[in-house]
């Protein structure tokens, strides 16, 4: 949005510190303006709507309490930080949210001095904030460090590792638990208010220490009396609040607090600032707050595409028939397989809707497991199932599988267990940018012994790959992209694919395109268009298998062509083309060949639509066509000379 379209009071916020001087009425008005701006932009650009709507008041309270030019705030994941962006100098550019060359959907230090740590994946905030707190103390500074983490992110082991270390180190640190799964009980809230406002105050802590010292001085029974007193206090607090868990981590606990009451939030944040040890402020919020469709369906509006703000309905792309997504095909195929094979268990890490396993949850609830945001646990859990004769399908976004690397090596591949890793969102995902692109899975999986990798070229190939998985008694990774397929009809009874065998889709001479995964069809289209325009025919080969490679077919193609064009939507470093070139180098088959590769460069690809990013990197029909013309020219020049 431009300055002229920034709603109401929000347009008057020139710097973050302006929030601290606002009246209660102004804060309510500003909260409404923030929600208007967020809904308007996300309805046009897509994004994480419900999480950001739920923390508007919390954001206002934080900016009323802390100085973001001095104090440090780490947002966990960061998809709830839209209000923070609007209030920290980016309101005029907010209309570019998640667009190419626009502002990111996540906090990025290179974007703003008020984004103190880069995020995108879950559960990193406490560890990062603790490191920043230690850095503060080592430097002799006195600012506050705050981590804001959701209850979902708190399920991950990394978050508990951070809590454990923070409690042990005892550094001054504030953790805000944004809990949008609980409702506020008036009775619990009243008692909690008393406990947090009194037992957590400085004078109460001093009295507590003095009493402990006095009790310990009593000969014979002092230590026992101190232990009894602590048990009594903890029992009282934990009976009415969840504070016992965090007290066990040696955090002072405050809460729960109504996350939509700015006055209460400010009061308790000020209280948290007085603590000389780690403190956790438990805040209860409502996901999607202030927008009825999002409040009614927060899961759908967690991450949403373009929609009509008046109704919340998705914007329709005209009269074009909507094709099924790869995720849809995966979910339905997995259900069909499970209908036939009782060994199949579906596992996801807090993403049943995102991975398409929600239909499996409904049809086979006893064989569906959502492990929460615990990708490491998901893989080892699957290994335990596999070693007992089951066939676990682990559905995880490619970018999140990075957390499971050791478990894939140690628990799955060394034991050669038939765990099927289903890598959704492999390749370029679009507007969520570098933290979410599935850029590296081929590179970090293909060198692991016993691992097989298949990259289906379309939705029908994905279906067949899943049937193939049931016939392999070894680990298998199936990678497929975000978005809709190519409209290829699905088979009623798919046949398993032969392992390590690709397919020649077009015969030509001189130049061969060797592609894999979602870039096969654009490569074929480019070759066919080139043939129509110039009469030059390039061979198009779908390798399909990244491991084991279709070695015999590749060597035959290389022997018959002078130039090779590799196309893949993975990092070129260590990816599919690297694997083929290693094979050719080992077989001394590269001499005199013209080589060209199209893939992801050795840099983090920024945000944009999938189409924009593919065009910019040449991973589209036009890009492949341009490379083919250049290779044909190179071959012709070499022949002429």
UniProtKB/Swiss-Prot annotation:
One of its GO terms (cellular component) is cytosol. It catalyses: D-glyceraldehyde 3-phosphate + pyruvate + H(+) = 1-deoxy-D-xylulose 5-phosphate + CO2. Its EC number is 2.2.1.7. GO terms for molecular function: 1-deoxy-D-xylulose-5-phosphate synthase activity; magnesium ion binding; thiamine pyrophosphate binding. GO terms for biological process: 1-deoxy-D-xylulose 5-phosphate biosynthetic process; isopentenyl diphosphate biosynthetic process, methylerythritol 4-phosphate pathway; terpenoid biosynthetic process; thiamine biosynthetic process. Mg(2+) binds at residues 151, 180. Its cofactor is Mg(2+); thiamine diphosphate. Binds 1 Mg(2+) ion per subunit. Thiamine diphosphate binds at residues 79, 120-122, 152-153, 180, 291, 375. InterPro entries: Dxylulose-5-P_synthase, THDP-binding, Transketo_C/PFOR_II, Transketolase-like_Pyr-bd, Transketolase_BS, Transketolase_C, Transketolase_CS. Pathway: Metabolic intermediate biosynthesis; 1-deoxy-D-xylulose 5-phosphate biosynthesis; 1-deoxy-D-xylulose 5-phosphate from D-glyceraldehyde 3-phosphate and pyruvate: step 1/1. Keywords: Isoprene biosynthesis, Magnesium, Metal-binding, Thiamine biosynthesis, Thiamine pyrophosphate, Transferase. Catalyzes the acyloin condensation reaction between C atoms 2 and 3 of pyruvate and glyceraldehyde 3-phosphate to yield 1-deoxy-D-xylulose-5-phosphate (DXP). HAMAP family: DXP_synth. Belongs to the transketolase family. DXPS subfamily. NCBIfam families: dxs (TIGR00204), PRK05444.2-2 (NF003933). Homodimer. This is 1-deoxy-D-xylulose-5-phosphate synthase.
